[in-house]
Amino acid sequence: MAQDERAAGGDRCPRQAHRRARPVSAPASPSPLELTASDGRTLAGLVLEAPGARGALAINGATGFRREFYLKFAGYCARRGYHALVYDYRGIGASARRPLAAEEARMSDWGRLDMPAALATLAARFAPLPLATLGHSVGGQLLGCMPNHALARAHVMVATSTGYWRRQRAPFRYLALGFWKLHGPLMLQLVGYVPQGLLWPGESLPRGVFLQWRKWCLQAVPFGPVLDEELRDSRYAEVRAPLLSLSFSDDPIATPAAVEALLASYPNAQIERRWIRPREAGVRHIGHHGFFSERHRDSLWRAALDWIDARCA
């Protein structure tokens, strides 16, 4: 079941979302929280607890983004009444093993093991509060790999799509192709991982993460069918909860074609699509990760939390 709300032509404007927002409580400070995945791997998390909380939110990040990138948004969620958890996937930031060339993490581990650990931690720590997830890019792609996805009442996807390079916007897609075919493989030969640098501004990527990500981005196969041996136990068709997809017209990665290809992998979810132009949020640019800028606190952030409120109240 899909409900299509497009930003052009009479949709709810994000700038008006503050009219429906609930009162904001006192700010929260992050506290360290160690997560333990089902395979025993520990992950570095930070939790922001909300006074008088009415729910809890797991924030599943994008590839190469550390947990600290999401702290301002998590703080806003806590002020809105949601315990918020941010964390680093295995192989990334504070959850990486050193030397990074010896790190064995794969991208599928994030969906099969790490994201479930985050949700399970919230369930154990904050029961019986309702749970939700918010996934940025790969954090939404791999929702269907989570064996415990049904613990959450609702899911928000931000700039989430397939990574297939041909669905991306030119000239970005040609830069991406160069990254997959030339830069990444060369770095693996030289140092054993893909380091942070001019051609890859994100966190350094372990070999297994890069190679699996590369494989997925060079083929058009959707996430529902088998992409990889490690995704054979995926549960995309089992996701039935409400799902909000937030996409942005100036995002060169999560284009309409790429977003729709990803959402097709969730055939039974209650999907609501919002295609947002930057001017709808009162800005010139949002792109692939601009949603998490604090300037969107009274527009995009409020709209996302209002949507979660309506499903977790």
Give the label of every model feature segment.
Residues 104-124:
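Alpha/beta-hydrolase active-site loop
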Residues 134-221:
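Alpha/beta-hydrolase-fold enzymes
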Residues 67-69, 74-99:
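Conserved alpha/beta-hydrolase
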Residues 24-48:
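N-terminal cap/lid segment of alpha/beta-hydrolase-fold proteins
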Residues 255-265:
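Short alpha-helix in the alpha/beta-hydrolase fold that links the catalytic acid
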Residues 276-313:
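Catalytic active-site module of serine/aspartate enzymes centered on a nucleophile-bearing elbow/loop
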Residues 239, 245-247:
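Short beta-strand/loop motif that positions the catalytic acidic residue
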